[in-house]
Amino acid sequence: MFKKILIANRGEIACRIIKTARKLGIKTVAICSDPDLNSPHVNLADEYFNIGGNTSAESYLIIEKIIDVLKKSNADA
């Protein structure tokens, strides 16, 4: 079983994943762009990383940023 997972999503879907992971004893890592810093998924996660940018094209859609966070956070998946 995974001990820590990276949630490469935001909004309600990310919140549901985080809540379920918590029930299973799995730690969570969220990513966020600058405008999403105070979003619910960021506040619910055990850890978060700001990947910068103001738009999805500048943040969530840059796979290299997500992979970098995966490595830095030591998440299993």
Residue ranges with predicted function:
Residues 1-77:
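ATP-binding N-terminal substructure of ATP-dependent carboxylate-amine bond-forming enzymes
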